[in-house]
Amino acid sequence: MITNGSITYYHKTLDNNKLPVWNRYVFESVWHFGGKGSNINKGYENANDVNIRIPMEYVEDKNIFTIGDIISIGINPPISKTTDLLYTEFYNVTSVTINEYGNNPHVHLGGK
């Protein structure tokens, strides 16, 4: 699979006090398309949508991917709250598809 960048994936869990904890995962060889200002066929309706494919060879635990998690473009530091990402390009995960079969097994993430 051709790759064109890296992402930082923040998976949300809750601690004993029911407060959010953001677990950080860095994927350095991913394919991503779209994002802020990308407007090819659907105009501004889908201008902030992003699609990311992570080759399965780089995924240690496919169960970390959940709708509502956060994708940040590039390699970014750990966070304790979502406002820590204020000055980075980030997206909320809106879809997760695990494609384990075929020529290019990968995790496909959609975000807004």
Predicted segments, located by residue:
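Active-site-proximal polar cores
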Residues: 1-27
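Short, conserved turn/kink motifs that form compact alpha/beta structural patches or helix kinks used as
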Residues: 20-112
